[in-house]
Swiss-Prot record:
Residues 92-308 form the RNase H type-2 domain. Its cofactor is Mn(2+); Mg(2+). The gene is rnhC. Endonuclease that specifically degrades the RNA of RNA-DNA hybrids. Keywords: Cytoplasm, Endonuclease, Hydrolase, Magnesium, Metal-binding, Nuclease. This is Ribonuclease HIII. Belongs to the RNase HII family. RnhC subfamily. GO terms for biological process: DNA replication, removal of RNA primer; mismatch repair. InterPro entries: RNase_HII/HIII, RNase_HII/HIII_dom, RNase_HIII, RNase_HIII_N, RNaseH-like_sf, RNaseH_sf, TBP_dom_sf.
Amino acid sequence: MSQQVIVTTKEQIQKMKKYYLSQLTSTPQGAIFRAKTNNAVITAYQSGKVLFQGSAPESEASKWGNVPLNDKKKHSLEQKHSYSPQAELFTDNHIGSDEAGTGDYFGPITVAALFATKEQQLKLKQIGVRDSKHLNDTKIKQIAKEIAHLQIPYSLLLLPNGKYNKLQAKGWSQGKMKAMLHHHAIDKLLQKIDVRSLKGIVIDQFCQPPVYKKYLQSEKKTLHPNTTFITKAESHSISVAAASILARARFVNAMDELSEEAKMELPKGASAKVDQTAARLIRSKGFEELDKYAKTHFANTQKAQKLL
């Protein structure tokens, strides 16, 4: 299990507690709060130390700074390791891959991988491709259509909730599901391109590279050559940023489809509003049907049941 520690102020810890309100669990002695997300278990202590432990603690910690205060110079390219990309790769011909839907109770997980040459990267920038976190759903859908019109090679995978829940019941962590989705998306994309022009692969890092490799090895797969990992990859690589938009657009469309099928709007995220909607859905369709709409191992399921 990986871990990440940050040191912050008590004011920031209170903001964090409010942010994780719907995911709080029992608080251990000496702690201010403990919360459990799909990426990590977060424990905040009176000393100001916040510990993130789980399959992707870096991803969760990055929301709050990701590194101890006054230590950011060590992270000029985020967390450096033997699988870190060289800066020049970001402007060369490369594949980028990213996912969406992992922290959302309702809806699937989607993963996209996209290959862009130097020339295509310029076109992607011209149509407004950038970090999808700074774009609303309407803009994401629009740019995703424009990416498709550019005929830039990509692959897009969707893991529906029913399959997600079956894998989770078999003992798969979400980290393993994401690793296999990234691997298969890249596999499919490699079949569409001339690999001789490929200089490398950039994956938006959600776990340590050795952990990612173990996930692949457990399914008798191996890491693709020249694969690199970096956190916040979409802010470095236009290929990852474009893949992120494609994955997010597919997730948003899937949420629209599920909402129409459920005959109620299914909110994104994992907030108290999600708990209330899940309770309504259970009343309307029965608990068994929840499997088609939600990641049922999330704490929201138990919270929804308490509202019935």
